[in-house]
Amino acid sequence: MNIETTDNSPLLQECIEELISSKIDEGKGRTAGNYRSAWNKLSTFLGPRVTEFTFVDLTTDFLHHYLLWLMQGEDGKQAPLKPGSLDFYIRNLKTMYNKIAQDKQMDVPRESPFSGLQIKVPPTRKRALPSLDLQNLATLERPKNPHACTALHLALFLFYARGMCFVDVFNLRHSNINDDYIHYVRSKTGVAMQVKITPEMKNIIFSYRRFNNPWIFPFLHEKISGEGEVTAQSALRRVNRHLKKMGEQLHFEQPFTTYVMRHS
């Protein structure tokens, strides 16, 4: 892709679009999505200037004004962002800046324009269900709503599988099972893992087995009327939507999600 330049510096918009496309080609859709979100936020700040803003315009002074804009809720148009959200936008912008500089062998200042930006993010409190709530879930009568039922079974599976992350469960196939163990590669780290299949897990797996269907949880890959392409993220949103309703009906003190079950 040929990048247009202004004063010998490439346009930031085109650099970032190229970077996002490369991540999609590499199969790193989640990273591409993070980059897209960070760029969309910066584009909103730039407004009409976005078409002429160059790589070298990303200075320390500019970034301080951008951060202030984010902290003030886009000049009062939105609610002020929490530290975690501020960190997300700045961190991904910094990653893109460094990646573009490396790939295009750009001349950059000795001191990074991001060096003075420090966002203190408070540690995330681990969310977990109390043991009594877990016992109630395990003995809960099968929900009449089929989508709520599959969401409950999936949540219990995450718990029995020692906190396996949703993306890895989404990708599980029956070919991953061997000698009462599930063998898989953790998507986040690339590390090979194995999990002993408990009797509870075996019952859940068996109940969703479909002839000539490779997926352990085929319902996660089924397209729902009115929804777009099924991805791990869209399936996760669907499952969490039903879990949250279930948690409200059971009067849980916190929102009931797959994240909560993984850390219980």
Predicted regions and their residues:
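N-terminal helical hairpins
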Residues: 1-10
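N-terminal core-binding DNA-recognition domain of tyrosine recombinases/integrases
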Residues: 17-30, 40-125, 140-143
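DNA breakage-rejoining catalytic core of tyrosine-based enzymes
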Residues: 56, 120-139, 191-198, 213-216
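Short, basic/aromatic-rich helical patch in the C-terminal catalytic core of site-specific tyrosine
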Residues: 63, 93, 169, 258-264
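Short, charged phosphate-coordinating catalytic segments
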Residues: 98-107, 158-179
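Basic, Lys/Arg- and aromatic-enriched nucleic-acid-binding interface segment
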Residues: 113-166
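Short, basic (Lys/Arg/His-rich) helix/loop patches that form interaction surfaces
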Residues: 144-146, 240-263
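C-terminal catalytic core of Y-nucleophile DNA break-rejoin enzymes
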Residues: 189-207, 214-245
